[in-house]
Amino acid sequence: MKYILPVLLFPMKRILLFLLLLGIFKASIAQISSDSLEYRIRPDSLKTGELQLSFQNFNFMRNYEYFNKIQDGYTLFGTQLEPQLVYFAHPRLVITTGLHLQKDFGATGIYRTLPLVSLKYKNGNTTLINGVLEGNIHHRMAEPLFDFEKRITEPVEYGTQFMIENKSLFLDAFINWKRMIYKPSPVQEQILGGLSVDYKLIKNSSVQLSIPLQLTAFHQGGQIDIAPEPLQTLVNTAIGFKLKIPLSGFVNSLRTENYLMGFNDFSFTDVQAFSKGHGWYLNTGFDTHFGSLMGTYWKGMSFISSNGMPLYQGVSQHIEHAGFTEKNRKLLMLRYSYQKQLIPNLFLDFRFEPFMDMGRPAGNRKIEFSNSSFLVYRQSFKLLKPRVDR
């Protein structure tokens, strides 16, 4: 299809290697900003030799009042705790080790416990990470490609990540090894490669303009499994532009973020309902001291995303309607968000996102919505100072 962005037809492992070697773009923040939810630990030449205790507590409530056939209605309510030991081994190297724990309210015991181990090397504007990635929301991908909810449901990603960060350029290229297998495995391995890019063309006091480029490549297969399912290789792409106009007064800024998205199934065997598709993801809104308001329009045609929010897709993940297809999706959303630092190290993030399915007959259209609140506390404590040789 002429609207689909071209994707190199390399074997999957070459695609993933290609993502790591790319170094010419920058990641983008799509739709609602999640800056207050990001947490990055990096090497620091002023802390060389120090041992710190890093503490992050992420409290979440995300509720979906959905009554459609594509995405379920449900509530995620709980807390995550991540204590980590952070050793600044060298001006360019930091090593971290710790635990991720998740407690879901209303459930018995700890829902999930995962190890956190990472090595981060930073040289100038480039960073190489191995182990636990700066994942999910840190990739800054648009929701149709990468579901925001994965901050809760898949909070820890393991693999390798390469980043470039400067005033006009930020690149996030990563391999997330989702499932490892051992011979003979009853299930297939799963790998997700990604590239999230945003190149700033103009940035001054009167206007900011940038070009985002995003790509995910999901592979499920392997050569040492005995699973009967055929291998799958699904690729999603996005390209667009972001424009922000700073203002003074009640409205701080006007902004628009718009994307053309593509889907291609490069599997040898047809498993998905559609082999290719595309979608338009259009966002326009404004920011004030009392929060941000944004209108969103989505038009998807045969669109599937391996990691995106189910609502935007043409194939249902609903518990009662799994496999139901809706080739053409038209959604109209109004999205309010409010982020604030309450006290040092404590951040609040609130979101209210009603939408209407414009693909339904006029008399059957209903307003559905999701609402979210996040309370995040993060702090670092010095445990060991660097030894000074006399």
Language model features by range: what are they?
Residues 75-81, 109-115, 154-158, 187-193, ...:
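Residues that define the transmembrane beta-barrel architecture of outer-membrane proteins
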Residues 139-144, 270-275, 285, 289-355:
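Outer membrane beta-barrel transmembrane domains
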Residues 127-198:
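Surface-exposed coil loops of outer-membrane beta-barrel proteins
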Residues 51-57, 97, 128-130, 162, ...:
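Membrane-embedded beta-strand positions of outer-membrane beta-barrel proteins
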Residues 81-87, 117-121, 160-164, 195-199, ...:
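Residues on the lipid-exposed face of transmembrane beta-strands in outer-membrane beta-barrel proteins
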Residues 32-50, 90-92, 125, 200-212, ...:
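Short loop/turn motifs that connect adjacent beta-strands in outer-membrane beta-barrel proteins
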Residues 367-390:
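Outer-membrane beta-barrel "beta-signal"
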Residues 55-63, 99-105, 123, 132-137, ...:
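Transmembrane beta-strands of outer-membrane beta-barrel pores
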